[in-house]
A protein has these predicted regions:
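Extracytosolic ligand-binding ectodomains
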Residues: 1-145
Length: 145
């Protein structure tokens, strides 16, 4: 999701609802605010995709699995067995930036937390996930703030 949707749709964007990952406080893992801060410092803007936390965790999971099973021979060539890699992925558990990461036997490794957001005005300068568009579902509770 990006501010371009507001510019492209103009006034028609007001009231438009979209599903997107829940990035409100408490919905992601404890490391999420640090990821957003470091990303913003590096690139000059916050991530525009709600899937950045899951992508980051997927990369961490892959690196942990590779570190666990990679074998290097005498010539310096590194080998990664497919079955060993798959088996390693299924055993790794960690607290990711998107929340707890642990793969089930079908390869689902994270619990996706969707939310519904609604655009409240047509001014592109007001774009900020959680503000415009604002989260309308699930309701934010005091314990998740």
């Amino acid at each position: 999701m990006a501010p371009d949707i507001i510019s492209a749709a103009g006034q028609a964007v007001v009231g438009y609802r979209i599903t997107y990952p829940d990035v409100s406080p408490g919905a992601m893992g404890a490391g999420y605010p640090k990821l957003v801060k470091e990303y913003t410092e590096t690139y000059g803007e916050p991530p525009i995709s709600g899937y950045h936390a899951n992508a980051y965790d997927a990369a961490v999971l892959a690196m942990k699995a590779i570190e666990q099973v990679a074998k290097t021979d005498a010539s310096g060539t590194t080998y990664i067995g497919r079955k060993a890699l798959r088996d390693a992925v299924l055993t790794i558990k960690f607290d990711g930036v998107s929340g707890p990461v642990a793969c089930d036997p079908h390869g689902e490794c994270a619990k996706f937390k969707p939310a519904v957001y609604e655009f409240t005005n047509a001014d592109p300068s007001t774009f900020k996930i959680g503000v415009n568009p604002k989260k309308v579902w699930p309701p934010t509770t005091a314990s998740s703030q």
